[in-house]
Amino acid sequence: MSGLQGPSVGDGCNGGGARAGGSCCRRRCFRGFGRRVQGAAFPGRQPAELGPVPRGLPAAAAPVCPAASAAAAGGILASEHSRGPSAAGGHPGPAASEPVLPPLPGPQRRATPGHTGCLSPGCPDQPARWSEWPGPSGPPGPELQQPGDTAGLCPADARSGCALAVSQLPL
């Protein structure tokens, strides 16, 4: 295997590629074989479509694997991502399939399905169920409770009186 033999597992393809400047998106190492398979990371896309890194740019500008990009966005090195618990905290990082999102601006209290809260500002003592609100996996924005919100109620329902509005909520 003279032309196909590549570096062993743990070099530029398995986690270290994003940090060392290699591109694991262009070539993927398979465990046990120790060889690179061109274009395996993106079916239907050839490595040439990814394009080389222009001269003068740092090696970090090279395309990297999506899992490594997500790990970098969360402050986790790709090598920690693939090896389990990190040396710093002893806790494993997020799974490669979990999106790493920046915190949303504004109030961070989220109205989750089935969560119990209070209507505000008119009747703070009346509990309300937010079951009709979008869950945490929905689009950001409408599911965040803003000051003065009535939990998932239409403005007309909220104006008609607290007792009536609460009685119409599904339990």
From Swiss-Prot:
It comes from the Eukaryota. Residues 1-22, 76-156 are annotated as: Disordered. Keywords: Cytoplasm, Cytoskeleton. This is PIDD1 alternative open reading frame protein. It is found in: Cytoplasm; Cytoplasm, Cytoskeleton. Disulfide bonds: none annotated. It comes from Homo sapiens. Residues 84-99 have a biased composition (Low complexity). Cleaved in vitro following UV irradiation to induce caspase-mediated apoptosis and this cleavage is inhibited by a broad-spectrum caspase inhibitor. Its main location: cytoplasm. Interacts with calpain-2 catalytic subunit CAPN2.
